[in-house]
Swiss-Prot record:
Domain of life from the UniProt record: Bacteria
Function: One of the primary rRNA binding proteins, it binds directly near the 3'-end of the 23S rRNA, where it nucleates assembly of the 50S subunit.
InterPro entries registered for this protein in UniProt: Ribosomal_uL3 (IPR000597), Ribosomal_uL3_bac/org-type (IPR019927), Ribosomal_uL3_CS (IPR019926), Transl_B-barrel_sf (IPR009000)
Cellular component per GO, a single term: cytosolic large ribosomal subunit
Gene giving rise to this polypeptide: rplC
Region of interest called Disordered, as start-end residue ranges on this chain: 113-151
Pfam families per record: Ribosomal_L3
Alphabetic keyword roster: Ribonucleoprotein, Ribosomal protein, RNA-binding, rRNA-binding
Protein name (Swiss-Prot/TrEMBL): Large ribosomal subunit protein uL3
Subunit field text: Part of the 50S ribosomal subunit. Forms a cluster with proteins L14 and L19.
Biological processes annotated in GO: translation
Amino acid sequence: MSKGILGKKVGMTQIFTDNGELIPVTVIEATPNTVLQVKSVETDGYEATQVGFDTLREVLTNKPAKGHAAKANTTPKRFVREFKGLEGAEVGAEITVDTFAAGDVVDVTGTSKGKGFQGPIKRHGQSRGPMAHGSRYHRRPGSMGPVAANKVPKGKKLAGRMGNKRVTVQNLVIAQVLPEKNVILVKGNVPGAKKSLIVVKSAIKAK
C-alpha cells in the first residue's frame, strides 16, 4: 500500500547513530493531514485521495472552498494535493507522520529555490572560455550551430530563468519519525526553501 503526506520544510540538521556516524537530515514538519475527498472511477474517472494541509485563514477563503471542506468536517486548507494508492482512506480521516517508519524509502517533491535570470555557466554548468585579455569568449553560451541551418537548434542551453521548478528527489531514506512533534527526518537534502510545501510519498522505484 502506498503512503503519502504533506508537510513544510523546516531546515537541515544532523543526527548521530549509535555507533557515532553523523547523518545530515532534513526536518519536515507534517501536522495531521485531512482527507477531503476520495475519488473513484465511477464518479471522477480515476482513483485518488485528496488531502489538505495547513489551515487557511477565513479571510482568504471563498464559499466553494468552505463547502468542500465542510463535507470533511474541517476548515479550508492552504495546500490541497492528490495521492494515488492510499487504500482505506475515508473522508474526514487524518493522516499523521506515524504512518511512516524509520527506514522507509520515499520520494520527496518540492519547489526549488528561484535564482532569477542566470547565464549558461550557472544555469547549466557549462565551462567558461579563456579569461585572457585577448579572448572574446569568457562566459558566453558558445556555438549556436552551423551557418546553413540559419536558426538556433531546439534544446540549445542558453541563459534564462533558473529554479522555481517542481523537483522530485527519489529514494530518500527516513532516518527518524517523531510523532509527538509531527516531524519526519529524511536523510540528505530536499528541494525548496524553508517553510515551503513538501510532498512525501512512498518511492515508486524503491529497490
